[in-house]
Regions:
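Non-DNA-binding regulatory cores of transcription-related proteins
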Residues: 76-143, 147
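N-terminal intrinsically disordered, low-complexity, charge/repeat-rich segments that act as generic
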Residues: 1-71
Length: 153
């Protein structure tokens, strides 16, 4: 994981990462207790190895999340709504008149099924810096799509 660049996260994104750390801490505590009881009962070495492996995996995940949190900045609540930037919520209309609402986030928070797209994605890159009423042309594979930017929140 690249630790030298700052990431910009929403307040909710920071909160979710902190919840993940808490969840990992709870699971680590359970596994460490389980390891003690397993060692006391002299169960098979296979079970102990599995527990130790899981503990190492969780500690690694926790380190990565803490590193992301240490190198992250929270997006400001107020920003210029005249142009699309990281943290903007945008409304787009496609050629068929369908409305899409998307939030521009850092890649770590991206979840297209929940309407959060990465600023580094093709659509995210096309939107950054645009203003209301601009048309965004996007080519995916052989298909060219045009979207109208109708609102920035």
């Amino acid at each position: 994981m690249n630790t030298t660049t700052d990431r910009y996260l929403t307040r909710r994104g920071v909160k979710n990462l902190k919840k993940q750390v808490t969840k990992i801490d709870k699971e680590l505590t359970k596994l460490e207790n389980s390891l003690k009881t397993t060692e006391a009962s002299k169960d098979s070495r296979f079970v102990i190895d599995n527990i130790l492996s899981r503990i190492e995996q969780l500690k690694s995940e926790k380190r990565e999340i803490k590193q992301v949190l240490a190198n992250s900045k929270v997006l400001p609540r107020k920003r210029d709504r005249l142009y699309v930037a990281l943290g903007s919520i945008v409304d787009l209309i496609d050629a068929k008149g369908r409305l899409m609402t998307l939030m521009i986030v850092d890649s770590i928070e991206a979840n297209p099924s929940n309407g959060k797209i990465s600023a580094n994605s093709p659509l995210g890159e096309s939107l950054i810096g645009k203003t209301i009423q601009e048309t965004i042309s996007l080519t995916i594979g052989c298909r060219k799509t045009e979207l109208q930017l109708v609102a920035i929140r």
